[in-house]
Amino acid sequence: MGTTLDIKIKRANKVYHAGEMLSGVVVISSKDSVQHQGVSLTMEGTVNLQLSAKSVGVFEAFYNSVKPIQIINSTIDVLKPGKIPSGKTEVPFEFPLLVKGSKVLYETYHGVFVNIQYTLRCDMRRSLLAKDLTKTCEFIVHSAPQKGKLTPSPVDFTITPETLQNVKERASLPKFFIRGHLNSTNCAITQPLTGELVVEHSDAAIRSIELQLVRVETCGCAEGYARDATEIQNIQIADGDICRNLSVPLYMVFPRLFTCPTLETTNFKVEFEVNVVVLLHADHLITENFPLKLCRT
């Protein structure tokens, strides 16, 4: 066994807020004593923006603006140059989670075209003959809860051939009448999206009904913007030709890391939508879309 580095963060869930102290230990393990030129710890937060393949041709001039946006970057020395004894050595550290100037700590978010990530990187510098050691560890930032109470915004909906948009041959569609409601499209990110759906009538047999959560990511600048919608998760809420006039509950938990409070900045936007998708046996696909506003309470 050679020399290994590890970073252990004090909080088990690794979740921190702006202004808090990030603390833990750097663990150095070695069977022999280790000579080193110093051990440092770097905290970094970046927003990585990426264009989808379909946008690249249109936005070549746009590449300059899609450089990673740095939110936070600071380094502290954990150990001065010297010698570490054999065995396991734990060096405690504390890092204030503070940003400079008008910058904002956006919430951690792992998307497709927008990625907001915070990392701690430990570097042990060694002499020319020995390889430098590096260890990286991710921690999670949550935005501050919004002030005031969340105002519910219930939505009632009906889906019929007449309410559908983008239909080429409306006359060929089988007759159906589906109604339901969402309890709120203003959603606390820690609470599930809930509602119900009732199929009152359908000439064609129903194959399945699904609830689909979609992220809409926009990367933009002076030259233009690219807007892409991608699926986060899909939940089947009914399988087969369900009974008519039966209330089917809608229930969806927002997945951690893959969702964040709805975010709008000068360079990028992260928004969320939910689709109610009904698939009929004649391969007709019916989709009803609802924009959501997510926030942390």
Swiss-Prot record:
<dbReference type="GO" id="GO:0032456">
    <property type="term" value="P:endocytic recycling"/>
</dbReference>
<dbReference type="GO" id="GO:0005768">
    <property type="term" value="C:endosome"/>
</dbReference>
<keyword id="KW-0967">Endosome</keyword>
<comment type="function">
    <text>Component of the commander complex that is essential for endosomal recycling of transmembrane cargos; the commander complex is composed of the CCC subcomplex and the retriever subcomplex. Component of the retriever complex, which is a heterotrimeric complex related to retromer cargo-selective complex (CSC) and essential for retromer-independent retrieval and recycling of numerous cargos such as integrin alpha-5/beta-1 (ITGA5:ITGB1). The recruitment of the retriever complex to the endosomal membrane involves CCC and WASH complexes.</text>
</comment>
<comment type="similarity">
    <text>Belongs to the VPS26 family.</text>
</comment>
<dbReference type="Pfam" id="PF03643">
    <property type="entry name" value="Vps26"/>
</dbReference>
<comment type="subunit">
    <text>Component of the commander complex that is essential for endosomal recycling of transmembrane cargos; the commander complex is composed of the CCC subcomplex and the retriever subcomplex. Component of the heterotrimeric retriever complex consisting of VPS26C, VPS29 and VPS35L; within the complex interacts with VPS35L. Interacts with SNX17 (via C-terminus); the interaction is direct and associates SNX17 with the retriever complex. Interacts with SNX31; the interaction is direct.</text>
</comment>
<dbReference type="InterPro" id="IPR028934">
    <property type="entry name" value="Vps26-related"/>
</dbReference>
<dbReference type="InterPro" id="IPR014752">
    <property type="entry name" value="Arrestin-like_C"/>
</dbReference>
<dbReference type="InterPro" id="IPR014756">
    <property type="entry name" value="Ig_E-set"/>
</dbReference>
<protein>
    <recommendedName>
        <fullName>Vacuolar protein sorting-associated protein 26C</fullName>
    </recommendedName>
</protein>
<dbReference type="GO" id="GO:0006886">
    <property type="term" value="P:intracellular protein transport"/>
</dbReference>
